[in-house]
Amino acid sequence: LKRIKKNNKFIYLISPSKIKSNNFYIELDKVLSSKKVSFFQLRLKKEKKTNKIFIGKKIKKICKKHKVKFIINDDPIITKKLNADGCHLGQKDMNILKARKILKNKIIGITCHNSINLAKKAIKNKADYLAFGAFYSSKTKKIKYRTNLKILNLAKKITNTPIVAIGGIKLSNYKKLLLNKANFLAISGYIW
């Protein structure tokens, strides 16, 4: 889709669950300067909205400097308020059609867990990317849904919509996902 351009920047970086100090912004600037990151997702589940907006404004500047798409997790309202590049929606978050009315032509990505049916629904509703996972064990999040390369390959057969692979991705396993045509690799715990 037009909102996501193909390039060799395959990392979809996700924030730590808490941003405790100003050192984070310095680290983020360094990581984004590697020119391997396409997306940065702000994922602060337990933070107040006002703090998310405050933190989001700082991160947006860093993302813009490095030409990295800035994505907000779960919340189309904050996405719009920050004028972020897009929003990532889980299955229990706002419906994509409702989110699209708020966000217009911004990027909307959808969690599909390990389900081709959820992927088909997201494709029908014109999601900009599909996220599948967890592919591997992760220290960032308790694993509820486990997926595999078979699901990834099935998804690639039914759509050209970009696919983000999630869950426990690190140096020892990332190549297998890229070789099986995942477009982006979501990384959090391995970096932070």
PLM segments and residue spans:
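Structural preference for beta-strand elements that scaffold enzyme active sites
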Residues: 10-12, 37-41, 67-71, 85-88, ...
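Glycine-rich phosphate-binding active-site loops on the catalytic face of alpha/beta enzymes
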Residues: 13, 89-99, 131-143, 168-192
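Catalytic domains of carbohydrate-active enzymes, especially glycoside hydrolases
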Residues: 28-43, 125
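N-terminal active-site wall of soluble small-molecule enzyme domains
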Residues: 39-102
